């Protein structure tokens, strides 16, 4: 479906440019956009490689395990349906740690694995379990300490102070994270009260 939308937008844009006489502008924009995409990609890759390397060092030194153990009691309360030693809990913690350090691209496969494990716990039903809904809410609004991708994009566009976004980002993600947990709990207890 998304492919159809993209192709439709492209075709409509090209037809409109031909009718409007601005096909030359479209041509220039395509090449300029391709150049920018390469520049931004290399900037993002370098920052991602750096932070993924730091995460690997933290993992091998045991720092990630210590941090995960510190977070486990809180995470266990968020996901009481999941046994503490279940693989889903490990994937959830790893996903949240990756998001916490602004590594959204690294967090995605961990999130998918967590969902697969929770689906197994749910008996492979098509309806999402309470834990799956909570994970989606928390994952979408996860608190981010270092917004790595945003910093990389700001660096690619020659920002003089690319890390100025850190403070506002922490505040915004803290508010959204707390808000997501409150809303998730509200609807959970409301549904529980109705007996569903």
Curated annotation (Swiss-Prot):
InterPro entries: Gate_dom. It is a multi-pass membrane protein. One of its GO terms (biological process) is sporulation resulting in formation of a cellular spore. Keywords: Cell membrane, Membrane, Sporulation, Transmembrane, Transmembrane helix. It holds the Pfam family Gate. It is found in: Cell membrane. Its main location: membrane. The keyword Transmembrane applies. One of its GO terms (cellular component) is plasma membrane. The chain crosses the membrane at residues 1-21, 37-57, 133-153, 163-183. Involved in spore core dehydration; might be involved in the transport of something into or out of the forespore or could be required for some modification of the cortex peptidoglycan structure. This is Spore maturation protein A. It comes from Bacillus subtilis (strain 168). The lineage of its organism: Bacteria, Bacillati, Bacillota, Bacilli, Bacillales.
């Amino acid at each position: 479906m998304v492919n159809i939308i993209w192709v439709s937008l492209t075709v409509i844009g090209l037809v409109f440019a031909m009718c409007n006489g601005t096909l030359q502008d479209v041509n220039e924009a395509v090449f300029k956009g391709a150049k920018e995409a390469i520049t931004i990609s290399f900037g993002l890759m370098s920052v991602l490689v750096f932070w993924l390397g730091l995460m690997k060092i933290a993992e091998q030194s045991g720092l990630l395990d210590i941090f995960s153990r510190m977070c486990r009691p809180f995470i266990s309360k968020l996901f009481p349906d999941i046994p503490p030693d279940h693989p889903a809990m490990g994937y959830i913690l790893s996903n949240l740690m990756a998001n916490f350090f602004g590594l959204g691209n690294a967090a995605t496969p961990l999130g998918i694995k967590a969902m697969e494990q929770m689906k197994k716990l749910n008996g492979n039903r098509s309806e999402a379990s309470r834990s799956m809904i909570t994970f989606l809410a928390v994952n979408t609004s996860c608190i981010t300490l270092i917004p790595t991708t945003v910093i990389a994009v700001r660096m690619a566009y020659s920002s003089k102070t690319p890390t100025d976004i850190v403070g506002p980002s922490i505040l915004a993600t803290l508010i959204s994270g707390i808000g997501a947990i409150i809303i998730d709990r509200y609807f959970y207890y409301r549904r529980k009260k109705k007996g569903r």
